[in-house]
Design a protein with these regions (language model features):
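Active-site beta-strand/loop signature of hydrolases that rely on acidic residues for catalysis
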Residues: 26-65, 239-244, 417-424, 435-465, ...
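A generic structural micro-feature
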Residues: 414, 513-516, 607-609, 634
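Metal-dependent phosphoester-hydrolase catalytic domains
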Residues: 3-10, 29-45, 57-60, 69-70, ...
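N-terminal post-signal-peptidase region of extra-cytosolic proteins
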Residues: 431-437, 465, 598-606
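Surface-exposed cleft-lining segments at the edges of enzyme active sites
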Residues: 229-235, 426-428, 508-510, 538-545
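N-terminal signal-anchor transmembrane helix
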Residues: 375-378, 388-441, 445
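Structured beta-strand-rich core segments of catalytic domains in phosphoester-bond hydrolases
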Residues: 402-411, 424, 431, 450, ...
Length: 648
């Protein structure tokens, strides 16, 4: 029996995984620019058809087939250099760009190049000894996810793409330069080495697409993790990194004992991944256990899949390219259906997307387990991926801890005087570019004590996966409460400079609408010994939805129950003649604009507003002194600010 050894931090082994890790991180960053650009730039500002958006997204998946002719006609070295450099250059240029149109096309080209790189890299590592090919593929993939989340964590969940200046460009340039050095240092086989595998060995690669769906929407999404687990956004980032460490531990275990992942265990893993995916929207601390266990299982599965897929049979990359392209097509399709179900009436509920992704990845695990028994065991246990993951995890953990102690929330010990209502459009401005700093500056300059936010995302993939709740709270030094209305990460929030006594939320009547609505409330102590009730809401949006808005307004009145003092703010999607407004005014709430506003009070669309749909309503014991529409295009709505006082 061959003795097995344990290797400590092996820099040469990490170097063998580093190129795949960096390209993966850059590819995911480009993908998170592409999907929002399709929605917010091409669709919202350029009125592109949905079919056009779907076609462009599908092209990035189909692009993987280009690996076949590139490998054949350019050879191993030139094809890897060309495609790898394309990803790096596209990412760096996108970082420099401030133009949404240029962002769109750079991210499109960069994402397509990333899809081409995947089969090229797998073909390349197959030319190495079989015991190195698998770890280089899986280790690079999982470390890439870890690196990507570490960079986001350092920026409080905001992608570096949306941060201007030289500071975010510096680490990206260093990583790109290191990648070029790694490409130069690679050993390239002469001629046309065996680079493709049998169909039974590459079939499990189909699991990559569904796996990335679960990672991008849930497991690498600190906002989703925080909202579902019921923890602070900072803890959400830590939990994401802990999940990545669990995945790396599972991968190392899988590589050290590949023969243990037999079909029976593969079946159990597949069932667990499928069943756990049904619980990803269920709030509670149990989500943390699901996150860590699922990530560990995913890491073990990837060890088995990569060892199986790294086996070689013949030259070319036909099977590998086709399977990985199909995998990325599955990713695009599942992600599209998850978000399209909020806008299009589909024959199934969007909640099936996660179980479907878990099922496909689980089947990939089961299939790979049938082949894993034939894979030889490595004579060494390589712990270096865990060490690297731990180092990457400590970076945001330490930085966020320093932030927490150096920048505590600033608290006012007085009665609130200014309130703001702002539909922030997920921080996308009228040009289709995400700029949360512009939103923060609007709120900051308003001097508002309490802010009711609508259309705030904690990490929708089509919104750039930014946890705006956590980011704005940290940036402004304000307390925050949030509750999703359609899933855990999209809904309403309240920012406050005052202590929040208690808070809660409830859904509003939905009818047959696709997008769920609700209201969020908080209570604050005032100088008169009472409690100020503050409510923020966002009502149904369609032009033919007046009756549903009336029902939703009735629900708000029932909750309010004539308590005083109280303030109701929000995007009501209704102008003065509508029944919903009548319900609120007849119940005894007073329109702050009618009392103290100058002009017509139009708030939407922000560029050239022609509708008054954003409201602040006060109870009779409060009087609006000044009501102002703030002229800004940081969102597609203009915010509404009211300075008020207690009536004598």
């Amino acid at each position: 029996m061959q003795a097995r050894t344990q290797t400590p931090i092996a820099l040469h082994r990490l170097q063998m995984m580093a190129l795949m890790a960096i390209i993966t991180a850059f590819g995911l960053q480009l993908l998170r620019v592409l999907l929002p650009s399709l929605v917010w730039y091409l669709k919202e500002t350029q009125q592109a058809a949905t079919t056009t958006l779907g076609g462009l997204a599908a092209l990035t998946a189909i692009a993987g087939l280009l690996a076949i002719p590139l490998w054949r006609f350019l050879g191993q070295r030139t094809s890897l250099w060309t495609v790898g450099a394309a990803v790096l250059v596209a990412r760096l240029l996108e970082q420099l760009s401030r133009d949404p149109a240029l962002d769109t096309w750079l991210s499109l080209l960069g994402t397509a190049a990333f899809t081409v790189f995947l089969p090229l890299w797998l073909g390349h590592v197959r030319a190495a000894p079989s015991l190195e090919g698998g770890p280089r593929w899986a280790g690079g993939l999982l470390l890439g996810l870890t690196l990507d989340s570490a960079l986001k964590g350092l920026a409080n969940s905001l992608d570096l793409s949306w941060i201007g200046g030289w500071l975010p460009l510096l680490p990206l340039a260093l990583l790109a330069g290191w990648s070029l050095w790694l490409l130069r240092s690679e050993t390239y086989a002469a001629g046309m080495p065996a680079s493709d595998a049998r169909l039974v060995n590459v079939l499990p690669l189909l699991g990559l697409g569904p796996y990335l769906v679960l990672q991008a929407i849930v497991f690498q999404n600190s906002g989703w993790v925080a909202a579902t687990a019921g923890v602070d956004g900072r803890i959400g980032i830590w939990l994401v990194m802990a999940g990545n460490l669990a995945a790396l531990a599972g991968m190392v275990g899988g590589f050290s004992k590949p023969g243990t992942f037999r079909p029976g265990l593969g079946l159990i893993a597949g069932l667990y991944l499928t069943l756990s995916a049904t619980q990803l929207q269920v709030p509670g601390p149990g989500f943390i256990a699901i996150l860590l266990a699922a990530q560990f299982v995913c890491g073990w599965v990837w060890a088995t899949i990569s060892l199986t897929a790294a086996q070689t049979e013949r030259g070319g990359l036909g099977r590998t390219s086709a399977l990985l392209s199909l995998a990325m097509f599955l990713f695009i399709g599942l992600a599209f259906f998850y978000y399209a179900a909020l806008d299009l009436r589909l024959p199934f509920d969007r909640s099936i997307v996660f179980p479907a992704a878990g099922l496909v990845f689980g089947l990939a695990a089961l299939w790979a387990s049938r082949q894993g028994e034939r894979v030889p065991r490595s004579p060494q246990v390589d712990w270096s991926p865990i060490h690297a993951g731990l180092f990457l995890s400590l970076l945001p953990a330490i930085w966020l801890s320093v932030q927490a102690f150096s920048s505590p929330a600033r608290t006012l010990q007085r009665t609130p005087e200014r309130v703001l209502s702002y539909n922030i459009h997920s921080a996308y401005d009228i040009t289709g570019r995400q700029d949360p700093e512009a939103i923060a500056q609007v709120i900051e300059s308003s001097g508002a004590d309490i802010v009711g936010l609508q259309e705030i995302s904690r990490g929708w993939l089509i919104n750039g996966s930014t946890d705006l709740v956590h980011w704005l709270s940290q940036r402004l030094g304000m307390r925050v409460v949030f509750q999703g209305t359609s899933d855990p990460v999209w809904g309403n929030a309240i920012l406050s400079r005052l202590p929040i006594q208690q808070w809660g939320m409830a859904p509003l009547p939905r009818g047959d609408a696709l997008l769920g609505r609700g209201y969020l409330w908080a209570e604050f102590a005032d100088a008169y010994g009472g409690e100020l009730l503050f409510i923020t809401t966002h009502l149904h949006q369609t032009d033919d939805g007046a009756e549903l808005r009336r029902q939703q307004a009735t629900g708000l009145v029932e909750f309010w129950g004539e308590r005083q003092p109280a303030i109701l703010v929000g995007d009501l999607n209704a102008e003065p003649p509508e029944p919903a407004i009548g319900v609120l005014l007849e119940a005894g709430l007073a329109d702050a604009w009618s009392a103290a506003g100058q002009g017509d009070g139009l708030t939407y669309p922000a560029g050239t507003p022609d509708r008054r749909i954003d409201w602040i309503l006060l109870t009779p014991d409060l009087a609006a002194v000044v009501t102002e529409v703030i002229g800004t295009t940081a969102s597609d709505h203009r915010p509404l600010l009211v300075r008020f006082e207690h009536s004598p």
